[in-house]
């Protein structure tokens, strides 16, 4: 378990941060009722969006089946990432990237279980570009983790000895 500490610490941090920001913005600031709060207009606006699909509302559906399929997919990806980390025991950068995905995925699963949809509230626009989409801390985390896994988590050599053997 200690070998995977970066994975678990990152996933836990992201999950807690995601859920705390949602409680503060959606519940305490009552964004679910108000709908929009201009923080630093237009650069940062809290705009409530209930996402029943994946990124940008793709594959959204109001049926219970859609919700459960998306929960199952998120949990399957989470399980696969944990299995991969346990099997390969990669370095901390890859574990942190996987932890970003795991924490974000679980945060969005919790939303689907509590609200029936993912609570998206961050909206950023700039320089005449009006962004029509809202997102949340979990979405940012999943994106950054996926980028890290793609660019750092390949099947390249794990140690200097492996690199010498490969050349």
Q: Which residues make up each language-model segment?
A:
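Alpha-helical transmembrane bundles and membrane-interface segments of multipass inner-membrane proteins
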Residues: 1-167
């Amino acid at each position: 378990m200690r070998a995977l500490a970066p994975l678990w610490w990152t996933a836990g941090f992201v999950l807690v941060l995601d859920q705390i920001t949602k409680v503060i913005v959606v519940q305490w600031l009552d964004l679910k009722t108000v709908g929009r709060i201009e923080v630093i207009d237009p650069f940062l606006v809290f705009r409530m969006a209930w996402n029943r699909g994946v990124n940008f509302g793709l594959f959204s559906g109001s049926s219970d089946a859609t919700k459960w399929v998306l929960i199952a997919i998120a949990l399957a990806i989470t399980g696969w990432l944990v299995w991969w980390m346990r099997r390969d025991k990669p370095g901390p950068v890859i574990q942190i990237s996987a932890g970003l995905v795991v924490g974000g995925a679980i945060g969005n699963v919790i939303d689907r279980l509590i609200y029936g949809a993912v609570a998206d509230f961050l909206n950023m626009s700039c320089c005449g570009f009006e962004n029509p989409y809202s997102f949340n801390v979990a979405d940012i985390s999943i994106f950054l983790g996926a980028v890290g896994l793609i660019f750092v988590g390949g099947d390249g050599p794990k140690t200097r000895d492996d690199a010498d053997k490969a050349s």
